[in-house]
Curated annotation (Swiss-Prot):
Gene: accD
Biological processes annotated in GO: fatty acid biosynthetic process; malonyl-CoA biosynthetic process
Location in or out of the cell: Cytoplasm
Listed name of the protein: Acetyl-coenzyme A carboxylase carboxyl transferase subunit beta
Pathway assigned in UniProt: Lipid metabolism; malonyl-CoA biosynthesis; malonyl-CoA from acetyl-CoA: step 1/1
Family matches, as InterPro entries: AcCoA_carboxyl_beta (IPR034733), Acetyl_CoA_COase_Trfase_b_su (IPR000438), ClpP/crotonase-like_dom_sf (IPR029045), COA_CT_N (IPR011762)
Keyword list, A-Z: ATP-binding, Cytoplasm, Fatty acid biosynthesis, Fatty acid metabolism, Lipid biosynthesis, Lipid metabolism, Nucleotide-binding, Transferase
Pfam families from the UniProt entry: Carboxyl_trans
Protein's UniProt keywords contain Transferase: yes
Gene Ontology cellular component terms for the protein in this record: acetate CoA-transferase complex
Function statement: Component of the acetyl coenzyme A carboxylase (ACC) complex. Biotin carboxylase (BC) catalyzes the carboxylation of biotin on its carrier protein (BCCP) and then the CO(2) group is transferred by the transcarboxylase to acetyl-CoA to form malonyl-CoA.
Amino acid sequence: MTEKSNGMSWLSKITPPGMSKIFSKRDTPDNLWVKCPVSEEMVFHKDLEAGLFVTPAGHHMRIAPAYRFQFTFDGDYTEIETPEVVKDPLKFRDDKPYTAKLAAARKKTGRDDSMAIATGTIGGLDAVVLVQNFAFMGGSLGMAAGESFIKAAETALARKAPMIVFTAAGGARMQEGALSLMQMPRTTLAVEMLREAGLPYIVVLTDPTTGGVTASYAMLGDVHIAEPGALIGFAGPRVIEQTIREKLPEGFQRAEYLLEKGMVDKVVHRADIPATLARMLRVLMKKPGTSMPAALTPPAPDHVVADGGSH
């Protein structure tokens, strides 16, 4: 019998007993190293997390709601359960059923849909924070997201607290058709409820914020903050270029360009957002607060190598 037929190889003959068993069980995470889209450097994941998911080149990575809550609130916070809605009312199917895509997104993110709500304090002042999760079907706005937005607004009204929204979305969810488009006026009315109650509504625009989200609640804030480099617009730049058949200006639809044109009030590094929000809340709520969060200074990563290298 040959070595091939009985599954043996020359390597197995020289490997010490038990060694192959040890290595076969070794599990290496897929995201141990993360590539920076700007510098193309590889950044060690733990260093990226310690640096608030901002790369050494200054690129602000997209982050999950749990991290966003952790970075934003003074300390402890309480997540609020999001409302349940009818699943797949249109029985939509393209390459696969909508229900299958929902199940995959839920498994990937551990969330029921694209929005998460939490309450806590920022600078000692009570606040309701709503975060869109781009990892859940591109953060798209559907019935569940619309209901979550309204619940966050109602929570703010009940607590007489300001509402802060971190946007990150590709637009309305096409699998829900007109039902998703209906969420645009519904969320707009929720913002108006806050305004009538005299409660601040602050929007933090993160990468990307586009489509129906931009055309509704994302641009209705009393104050608009944007993270550096965030793509903000209705249609994407490639779609616009193909439509008008012209090259767009450098940095078109990026946070800094919109700041220059007066579309956003301030571009703020992620580390400075909690302190910035605290100052704004004190002014808008006309309250002194009890504490002032310090800027979250990201440590300089030690484990950064060129693309393809190893540490």
